[in-house]
């Protein structure tokens, strides 16, 4: 007789008084808002480090006792109220007055395409300077309220961890990202169905899932080729940041 194994994950119920933590975890504004990140750190600094400073991952693992006790901690709740007030005020801001002289928020839209975006280590789809620059552009654009969307690729494996073996050689260690722990969600069409798009790839069609994330005021879209109807080769297009060979890189550029 073969035993069946089930994997269960017990998650805490975030108290209504702290429901704003869920909002914070789903907006990459936390990547440049130190006060927002500090709330998670203050709840459980050890877990915060273990989760690689990932708010969504943190909220899935924090103990029920800790979040329940926090609602009775007057000092924490005062800081929580200040952070949420600042967060809501930021999102309510309109376009910076100087931007209005050059762009019409109702009719103009800037589209920014990049192979990587480095906003925060909890969203590992970047490797270096290009990604950090693109991420900083998104943050600055959000602060200014410019009508703007960012478009990139959603990699299952982003930057690698560098380790040194016993012989002094650098060893690259890749970690697969669990999308459920990223501040993203599927894009829906007018019927409320999950949106896929199709791209011609030299004689055949590649299907791509469309995901979206919010970084302050900046809306970001990401494409993901990990769909069963695609060939294994095409599913590799968004498997790893700068992975594969020249052909893979060209396919990534075509998708963008």
Pin down the residues of each PLM region.
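Catalytic cores of carbohydrate-active enzymes across secretory and cytosolic contexts
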Residues: 1-256
